[in-house]
Swiss-Prot record:
ATP binds at residues 161-168. SMART domains: AAA (SM00382). Its EC number is 7.1.2.2. Its main location: membrane. This is ATP synthase subunit beta. It comes from Solibacter usitatus (strain Ellin6076). Keywords: ATP synthesis, ATP-binding, Cell inner membrane, Cell membrane, CF(1), Hydrogen ion transport, Ion transport, Membrane, Nucleotide-binding, Translocase, Transport. It is found in: Cell inner membrane. Belongs to the ATPase alpha/beta chains family.
Length: 482
């Protein structure tokens, strides 16, 4: 029974992030209700004021909650106040340029977020009649993505890769390109990743002008963090907080929003920890039995409506590079495009280290992207696939044993491979190359000319870390003079 009055109970069991609270019978708060626990009347060095979320009703007036903030210093008998609604977070333009935590509190020491509206983090997905079925490509300015696995506006994109192959750098470049070229709003949800990365991202965005913490009208991105040091409850719910902030811009301001989740695997990992704390029987590989349901509740809210869209780019860590692991495999089912990052390509020094043969897109279709784009992408993939097939022969017999036609294919494939590299704006200080945004038409033109043999006389090295084909020809001229 839900009452409108404030219901007060007390803490009866504390076992790490799982906290059991007792309430009067008949006034038990429903599942997903926010519970505030305070240390008023207790003589402890640091006062406690934390938020938990109801997960289970365990009988005799008791509920099991999961803490969204650290539980150090929590003592049995402390006051537990039911807030009567789920966790609510500030939404609106006032969140831009700010760093918020899972419960919407600012963690950037820039004062309170004076938002006019608050939304609950648990909300239903848009209904069938509200959803849009329009298929339209979203230009990113990154050659390999735009040509081989074009992103769908309002779609879900997975960035797959093991540790350290460049998922976060691609996300940073996408935010930069969206803000600089499209003037759009982004929401970045840092789910269980390194605190240092979160801090670096915030500082980089200030330097590049993506955000101004002192003036939200000049900011293009809201940052929502639940980092590795946070309790599992925070890491499980911070994705929903980020999504709720993005939903405001889609539904109320009718914008096309980019939602970045780094890393969706940590969301699953946190769910597994919470599941164990709640005493559920583990499923395959020790994951939670409700893995697909949890993932669905998050993913189904990320969609296009007739008012606006949320295009989501999700970094997906692949444990031990095993794509059959239940966590990445469950995420696969929801995606419209996949950008697959390969350690082998990174080892060649080609960045972004995207594997063009393993990456896919639902909209790489001549009816959606056009005949020219589709044909060029297939020619590029065909050339790279032939090169891959010939690599065993080259390794055993050497390149001289190939036919003239195959030698030409290999030469063009190596140029294509080098041309797939691209200098990023956000990596300028590491690479020394000036960042380049490449329009789709320039990408198609450049790759088509390479596979058709127009640049067979240009040295391979001239194609490395360049933007357009004109940049390549300029580099080749400079190499000749040197």
């Amino acid at each position: 029974m839900v009452t409108t009055n404030v219901v007060t109970g007390k803490v009866v069991v504390v076992s790490g992030p799982a906290v059991d609270c007792e309430f009067p019978e008949g006034q038990i708060p429903p599942v997903h209700t926010a519970i505030r626990i305070i240390s008023e009347g207790f003589d402890i060095p640091t006062p406690i004021d934390i938020i938990c979320e109801v997960q289970q009703h365990i009988g005799e007036g008791r509920v099991r909650t999961i803490a969204l903030q650290p539980t150090e210093g929590l003592v049995r008998g402390m006051q537990a106040i039911s807030l009567g609604h789920p966790v609510e977070v500030p939404v609106g333009p006032e969140t831009l340029g700010r760093v918020l935590n899972v419960i919407g509190e600012p963690v950037d020491e820039m004062g309170p977020v004076n938002a006019k509206k608050h939304y609950p983090i648990h909300r239903p997905a848009p209904s069938f009649e509200d959803q849009s079925t329009r298929l339209e490509m979203f230009e990113t300015g990154i050659k390999v993505i735009d040509l081989i696995e074009p992103y769908l506006r309002g779609g879900k994109i997975g960035l797959f890769g093991g540790a350290g192959v460049g998922k976060t750098v691609i996300i940073q470049e996408l935010i930069n390109n969206l803000a600089m070229k499209h003037g759009g709003v982004s929401v970045f949800a840092g789910v269980g990743e390194r605190t240092r990365e979160g801090n670096d991202l915030w500082l980089e965005f200030q330097e590049s002008g993506v955000i101004d913490p002192h003036d939200y009208t000049k900011s293009k991105c809201a940052l929502i963090y639940g980092q590795m040091t946070e309790p599992p409850g925070a890491r499980l719910r911070v994705g929903l907080t980020g999504l709720t902030v993005a939903e405001y811009f889609r539904d109320e301001e009718h914008q096309d929003v980019l939602l970045f989740i780094d890393n969706i695997f940590r969301f699953t990992q946190a769910g597994s920890e919470v599941s164990a704390l709640l005493g559920r029987m583990p499923s395959a590989v020790g994951y939670q039995p409700n893995l697909a349901t949890e993932m669905g509740e998050l993913q189904e809210r990320i969609t296009s409506t007739k008012n606006g869209s949320i295009t989501s780019v999700q970094a997906i860590y692949v444990p031990a590079d095993d794509y059959t692991d239940p966590a990445p495999a469950t995420a696969f089912a929801h995606l419209d495009a996949t950008t697959n990052l390969s350690r082998d390509i990174a080892a060649l020094g080609i960045y972004p280290a995207v594997d063009p043969l393993a990456s896919t897109s639902r909209i790489l279709d001549p009816h959606i992207v056009g005949e020219d784009h589709y044909a060029t992408a297939q020619m590029v993939k065909g050339t790279l696939q032939r090169y891959k097939d010939l690599q065993d022969i080259i390794a055993i017999l050497g390149i001289d044993e190939l036919s003239d036609e195959d030698k030409l294919t290999v030469a063009r494939a190596r140029k294509v491979q080098k041309f797939l590299s691209q200098p990023f704006h956000v990596a300028e200080q590491f690479t020394g190359f000036k960042g380049k945004y490449v329009k789709l038409a320039d990408s198609i033109k450049g790759f088509r000319e390479i596979v058709e043999g127009k640049h067979d006389g240009v040295p391979e090295q001239a194609f490395y870390m360049q933007g357009t084909i004109e940049d390549v020809l300029e580099k080749a001229e400079a190499m000749k003079k040197a």
